[in-house]
């Protein structure tokens, strides 16, 4: 039988070195992190033959006390921690005391260091773990270490090294990441005496990015930032022009430590794909600052992996920060013209100053001046006919659907409807939309023609005279239009709405646009717990596979808040009794199964909010489809609803809903200009 052996120090050190020092870039990482922990502001790295022949690090840090120079190369000797309690509040990059002895056991090391308090420094030479000399030396404050002939006594490890070019590239990439994490430190990297990198150390992250990735990259970045009590997130994400087929240009730092974390990478990518469906991976430089006791960096030999005490919280924080920045970036490309935006703001201020009662009173006074004209064969209603001033061309409108008024004002609306009935208008639709023009509000609210045909509204997939998103007069007033009011000029291929504004042609994907309107409406209703439900005439019993039932059972509360009334029916069966009102025409069985499948793909670690969004995305199935013929009025109302949602520019799957071509761009296409 095999007996238990006690390994000698040399063998033990080489085994430890195999965990810490995998390749030349591992040596660079450990030594540069030591320099940073020493407070260095200028760090120079020199390598030869991919680091195999020479790795040299020079810094201007605090240095090592002369009495500690030899001690620093003993296993588990460190200045970073003292006891077990310190492990749970680590503020330094290194702390185990393994790097220097591990490196010294597999290479020839020349170590020099000097502190501010001493006139002379100390030089220690170690080869293969054996001390050769310890002498005084003359040098400036800081540390200089040379590592030569790496793996000279471990041929098994040496033969697994990549080519010189590959090892050099890995070192270059590592120094780039460390430079990003420390913009206040100047880094210089030399490869075979050729300068590869030189950062300024001025504390500006964008300058480091420009130095490493180039001017073009720096000009296509979007800054994001989010702060909570226990953590902060900030950094840059590239727009779609910087997306690539690999994740090579993704950098994640936690307390300035470069780490890899699959969950947080997915959080950034999911936020990015909400606005881009390129199928590629985004460029990003992400920083997370949090309390040391809320993370564990001691789970991997190279400290390249990290665990969070509350990973769901961090996931949501990262997702929200990136998503919000991307949304604002996209919105900025469709900004309202300055003149129209000023008029909108002026209108909003005026509405704020006037009470709602006063506004309704003003409407009552105007009823006497309203002329109605109804065609019996078309059953059309013309409300508030007027001739606008010729001097006023560019108008900003705030649309106030009557059926979304408060209870008090609904009573006024009811009186208004009765007066219409008394005038023999029996076929007038109860669903009205009154459009207010800012100039006309100031001039006793002169009125604009609004037409609708009751029959066409009832039969259309898109209820064009009912605002899909707004819920009240106040909500309608305070929402901000995200792009100008467009003039519809037609429909192309029964799929795209053509519209124009200010010498610009807009193309709107009718399905994607309606998808996003429904998605935001449903998401808002879920958040406010105001989902309108529709009972099924005949409840459906669905038998699920065991795995699917377990996922349903785990997320019961989420389905309930999303507007589904489902009860257990025994033996992995469920009974579907009620569904959200606008999903009642869809197949409930397929709907529930699809939602469960979506939740399965997400796993159990996702936040409740993300799961709600995934369920809300199913509302897209109720949207108008491609090849659906829409009237001009239906298209106008769809666009009007789109203008006021939070993000009108992308559907829930990330596809664009609206694109534009300026007159200049079209002229160039037709070669009218060069």
Swiss-Prot record:
Keywords: DNA damage, DNA repair. One of its GO terms (cellular component) is mismatch repair complex. InterPro entries: DNA_mismatch_repair_CS, DNA_mismatch_repair_MutL, DNA_mismatch_S5_2-like, HATPase_C_sf, MutL/Mlh/PMS, MutL/Mlh/Pms-like, MutL_C, MutL_C_dimsub. Pfam families: DNA_mis_repair, HATPase_c_3, MutL_C. One of its GO terms (molecular function) is ATP hydrolysis activity. The keyword DNA repair applies. It comes from the Bacteria. PANTHER family: DNA MISMATCH REPAIR PROTEIN MLH, PMS, MUTL (PTHR10073), DNA MISMATCH REPAIR PROTEIN MLH1 (PTHR10073:SF12). This is DNA mismatch repair protein MutL. It comes from Clostridium perfringens (strain SM101 / Type A). The gene is mutL.
């Amino acid at each position: 039988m095999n007996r238990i052996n006690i390994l000698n120090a040399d063998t033990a050190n080489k085994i430890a070195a195999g965990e810490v020092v995998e390749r030349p870039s591992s040596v660079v990482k450990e030594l540069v992190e030591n320099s940073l922990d020493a407070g260095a502001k200028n760090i120079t790295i020199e390598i030869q033959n991919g680091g195999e022949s020479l790795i040299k690090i020079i810094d201007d840090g605090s240095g090592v006390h002369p009495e500690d120079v030899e001690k620093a190369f003993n296993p588990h000797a460190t200045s970073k921690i003292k006891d077990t309690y310190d492990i749970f509040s680590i503020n330094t990059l290194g702390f185990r005391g393994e790097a220097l002895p591990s490196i010294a056991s597999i290479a020839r090391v020349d170590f020099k260091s000097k502190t501010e308090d001493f006139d002379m420094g100390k030089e220690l030479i170690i080869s293969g773990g054996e001390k050769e000399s310890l002498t005084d030396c003359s040098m400036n404050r800081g540390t200089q270490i040379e590592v030569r002939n790496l793996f000279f006594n471990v041929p098994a490890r040496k033969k697994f090294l990549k080519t010189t070019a590959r090892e050099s590239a890995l070192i270059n990439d590592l120094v780039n990441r460390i430079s990003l994490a420390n913009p206040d430190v100047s880094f210089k990297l030399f490869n075979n005496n050729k300068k590869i990198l030189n950062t300024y150390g001025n504390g500006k992250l964008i300058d480091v990015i420009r130095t490493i990735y180039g001017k073009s990259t720096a000009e296509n970045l979007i800054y994001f930032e989010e702060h909570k009590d226990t953590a902060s997130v900030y950094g840059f994400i590239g727009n779609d022009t910087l997306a690539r087929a690999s994740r090579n240009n993704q950098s994640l730092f936690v307390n300035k430590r470069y780490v890899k974390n699959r969950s947080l990478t997915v959080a950034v990518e999911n936020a990015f794909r909400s606005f881009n469906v390129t199928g590629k991976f985004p460029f990003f430089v992400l920083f997370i600052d949090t309390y040391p006791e809320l993370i564990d960096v001691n789970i991997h030999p190279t400290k390249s992996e990290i665990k969070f005490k509350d990973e769901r919280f961090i996931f949501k924080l990262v997702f929200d920060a990136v998503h919000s920045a991307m949304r604002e970036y996209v919105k900025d490309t469709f900004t309202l013209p300055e003149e129209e935006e000023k008029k909108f703001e002026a209108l909003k201020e005026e509405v704020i100053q006037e009470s709602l009662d006063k506004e309704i009173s003003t409407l009552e006074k105007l009823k006497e001046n309203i002329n109605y004209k109804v065609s019996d064969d078309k059953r059309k209603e013309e409300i508030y006919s007027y001739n606008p001033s010729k001097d006023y061309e560019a108008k900003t409108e705030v649309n106030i659907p009557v059926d979304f008024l408060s209870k008090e004002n609904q009573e006024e609306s009811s009186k208004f409807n009765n007066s219409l009935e008394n005038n023999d208008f029996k076929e007038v639709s109860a669903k009205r939309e009154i459009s207010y023009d800012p100039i006309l509000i100031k001039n006793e609210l002169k009125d604009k023609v609004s037409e609708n045909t009751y029959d066409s509204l009832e039969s259309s997939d898109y209820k064009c005279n009912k605002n899909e998103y707004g819920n009240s007069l106040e909500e309608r007033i305070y929402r901000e239009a995200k792009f100008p009011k467009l003039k519809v000029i037609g429909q192309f291929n029964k799929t795209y709405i053509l519209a124009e504004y200010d010498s610009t042609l807009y193309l709107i994907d009718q399905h994607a646009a309606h998808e996003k309107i429904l998605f935001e409406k449903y998401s808002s209703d879920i958040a406010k717990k105001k989902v309108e439900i529709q009972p099924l005439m005949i409840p459906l019993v669905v038998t699920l596979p065991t795995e699917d039932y377990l996922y349903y059972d785990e997320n019961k509360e989420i389905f309930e808040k999303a507007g589904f009334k489902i009860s257990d029916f025994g033996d992995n069966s469920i009974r579907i009794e009620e569904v959200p009102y606008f999903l009642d025409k869809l197949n409930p069985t397929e709907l529930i199964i699809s939602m469960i499948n979506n939740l399965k793909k997400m796993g159990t670690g996702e936040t409740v909010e993300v799961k709600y969004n995934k369920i809300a995305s199913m509302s897209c199935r109720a949207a108008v489809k491609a090849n659906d013929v829409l009237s001009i009025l239906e298209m106008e109302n769809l666009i009007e609803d789109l203008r006021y949602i939070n993000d009108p520019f992308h559907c829930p799957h990330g596809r664009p809903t609206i694109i534009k071509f300026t007159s200049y761009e079209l002229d160039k296409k037709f070669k009218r200009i060069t």
